[in-house]
Design a protein with these regions (language model features):
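Disulfide-bonded cysteines in secreted/extracellular proteins and peptides
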Residues: 45, 56, 94-97
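A short, polar/charged loop-to-alpha-helix boundary motif
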Residues: 50-60
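C-terminal binding/interaction regions
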Residues: 1-21, 63, 71-144
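A short glycine/serine-rich beta->alpha loop
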Residues: 43-52, 83-87
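Short beta-strand scaffold segments in enzyme catalytic cores
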Residues: 25-36
Length: 144
């Protein structure tokens, strides 16, 4: 089984859309990230009705990666609802997730997002944010 298949299977295992309360629902989007060392971490989204609480599956997976391994560099990311990414924007990260990936580690610009699971079409984070505002600051941090 290849990495993308393993990521899909691990994320699919936690796909379980449900209401947590009258105000919060969860698990309707799931994600898997492959860390620099090859470990796979998963996460699911949680959303609240008033808008102040929303955690995307991608960021949840990234939090888990950092919490359980201390890693910040990502190689691959896969996110989906009820089926694998199929193109046409499915599986693409929101702006907050794109930003968090780069703020976590500027080298994540080379990370690949799965766009179409069937054809294995991917896109790099750098293509999603070609002129990131934090590039200079990140370079200075890396030079410390």
């Amino acid at each position: 089984m290849g990495t993308w298949e393993k990521m899909y299977e691990e994320a699919r295992a936690i796909y379980n859309p449900h209401e947590v309360s009258d105000f919060v629902y969860a698990n309707h989007v799931v994600a898997a990230v492959e860390a620099e060392d090859g470990q796979i971490f998963t996460g699911f989204c949680m959303e609240g009705t008033c808008g102040v609480f929303h955690l995307c599956a991608e960021r949840a997976a990234l939090f888990n990666m950092y919490q359980f391994s201390g890693q910040t560099k990502v190689k691959k990311i896969l996110a989906f609802r009820d089926k694998p990414p199929y193109g046409e924007g499915s599986g693409m990260p929101c702006g907050a997730c794109r930003e968090f990936l780069l703020e976590l580690n500027a080298e994540n610009k080379e990370a690949e997002f799965m766009m179409n699971y069937e054809t294995r079409k991917t896109i790099k984070v750098a293509e999603l944010i070609p002129y990131w505002w934090g590039e200079e600051r990140a370079t200075n941090w890396q030079d410390k």
